[in-house]
Amino acid sequence: MKKVGLISLGCPKNQVDSEIMLGHLTKAGFTLTNKENEAEIAIVNTCGFINDAKEESIERIIEAGRLKENGSCKALIVAGCLSERYKEELTKELPEVDAFIGISEMEKIADVCNALIELHNAGAQRTVPLQEPVSRILINPQHYAYVKISDGCNNRCSYCTIPSIRGSYKSREIETIINEVEQLASKGVKEINIVAQDTTDYGLDIYKKRKLSALLKGLVKIKKLFWIRLLYTYPEHFDDELINIIASEEKICNYIDIPIQHIDDEILRKMKRNSSEKQIRGLIERLRRRIPDIVLRTSLIAGFPGETEAQHKRLYDFVKETGFHRLGVFAYSKEEGTAASRYKNQITQKIKDRRRNEIMRLQSKISLNKNRELIGKTLKALINGLSSESELLIEGRYYGQAPEADGVVYINDGTGLDKIRAGDFVNVKITEAHQYELVGKVI
């Protein structure tokens, strides 16, 4: 048997790519293993988005390279964004790697593996990407999955390398996405998390108009699917039709991830974002008016080149005033090849970290207060299984908690706990609240 081990790094979109590669490998007769010392071929699917992600990818590649000396590994393959972006440089710097395959070559993973294991020889020709994946092998628990509705991006944010790595926006057809989700639901997936670089831009390239609402109308008809969650939406592409379908369809979680990055109009202009403070505030007001129990998540960049203390304070005050349920802050990362990397008035790492930490400390208080508002309420929770914290706790999530990104609900009391399994839905009364986690009992 040919055994393959895969290390998946980066965002949920990269995880979907990993699952597609595993599907190709399984179809080609490879055996998958999560024991690195047993793998004949090691694959590292890398992330190249920001410096921290690149450093982690390099570290994991070097670790995997040691398996060729100390384990049964015969070949090492590096895939993903880092390979796409720095293939020539990495070939020189990492001679232990047998093959580098880019974003558009992942459907050839089985062919590359067969060639390497037989010949111990690198090589992968650039090919036209397959739009539709084979049946995926899920990395995460089997009751939820990420579904990538497009690849690439047409936004040209000044700090971002994604368009140069993954190209322009390429939507998948509605019918093929629905077919994939039907297959996932038939295998026990209860929740899908829709991902793309910009989910709200979906369909414009192939249908000449944005079609996320139409896609959602098709997905809600899938009988065995219970939760649909929208991630990576853009404020400038949100329309009333989309808000109305989220509000009216029970299966669509009242949870929206809207990365706004900043609130100051001058900074947004330098970021080459197409949104404005007025537009962002208006969208949040419309969402909360139409969907009173909506959970909003966003991400911000602290210390963008030229950001003044006054602009930072404006962002801080906006976060305090708005009260997002979930929020992440990244210290600005200077990425080569981007417009922002050439901007003057680059800010020191010390100041960037301070500004990030100030907002995160504020957000921890907001998150705690938001969670305290849930004490005494009964929420439907999707069970993950026994908690990694303690076998005495069962772990689940309510609609306001996205997998991996947000906190969880710990269940420590109630009837029928011994009969609860991963993938079950149960009603949980919240009894305790912490900054990011909730505690409750089954009722």
Please give the residue ranges for each predicted region:
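Proteins enriched for Cys/Gly/acidic motifs involved in redox and nucleic-acid/cofactor modification
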Residues: M1-Y202, E241, I256, K278-E285, ...
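Generic beta-strand/beta-sheet core signal
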Residues: I7, V195-Q197, L231-T233, P259-Q261, ...
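Radical SAM enzyme [4Fe-4S]-AdoMet core and its adjacent flexible, acidic
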Residues: C11, G203-V220, K224, K270-M271, ...
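Conserved SAM/AdoMet-binding glycine-rich loop
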Residues: A75-G80, R85, L90, S186-R314, ...
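Short, hinge-like loop/turn segments at secondary-structure boundaries
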Residues: L94-P95, I117-L119, R210-L212, I246-S248, ...
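Short flexible coil/turn linkers enriched for glycine and charged/polar residues
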Residues: I139-H143, C153-N155, I252, H262, ...
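Conserved, mostly hydrophobic/aromatic
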Residues: C157, I177, I194, L230, ...
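Terminal RNA-binding accessory module
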Residues: R342-I443
